[in-house]
Amino acid sequence: MKKKLSLTVSKLTCKRNSISIFNPLSFKVSEGQMLLIKGKNGRGKTTLIHCLAGLLSYQGLVKWKGVEGKIGYIGHKFGLKEYETVYDFIKFWKAVYGSKVCIYEVVELFSLFNVLFSPIAFLSFGQKKKLTFVRLYFFNNNVWLLDEPFSGMDDNNRELIFNMIESHISNKGMIILSTHEKGRILNIKNTKEL
């Protein structure tokens, strides 16, 4: 029997140079929910995401249940090969994850026709960030950790990301998302704030 997806965090703290980045945190997130980590720059949002991803050491308890495979993560560094074309990037990640999704479908969904054979180095910041969501789309996992996913995105790409988030939540996925944004993101169904 498949375990229900959940994340339980108890008394989580993280220190750098013996200084606490944030006060001890405790919260629970279940499948079909998004935890919205709000706050100004420098308040520990990225540090918290890194702790949950296992990228930083911490004190306290972080307990994942029902996670199938790996956790999808999008942060500030994209991990893109600048010399690679967009097409090569898409083809590579489709193969890595064994995705059955057609390349044409991805190119159309993410509006990549006009840059398909361009080297990634020629793309704007927002276009590069969009490619990280292409990778997440192929990954097809149930937990997403998204650190400031809307920064550098134009209105059309923001809409695309909003739709991906809403779809993921409605399909019983879980999202932990950090942002300093206000507005529509706060209105996504089944959202908890931290």
What spans do the regions from the language model cover?
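Conserved structural motif at the start of ABC-family nucleotide-binding domains
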Residues: 7-9, 21-24, 153
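ABC-family nucleotide-binding domains
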Residues: 41, 147, 153-154
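Q-loop/switch helix immediately C-terminal to the Walker
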Residues: 77, 82-100
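Conserved ABC ATPase "signature" region
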Residues: 101-116
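Conserved ABC ATPase signature
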Residues: 119-128
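Hydrophobic anchor residue at the start of the ABC signature
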Residues: 133, 172
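Walker B catalytic motif
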Residues: 148-149, 165
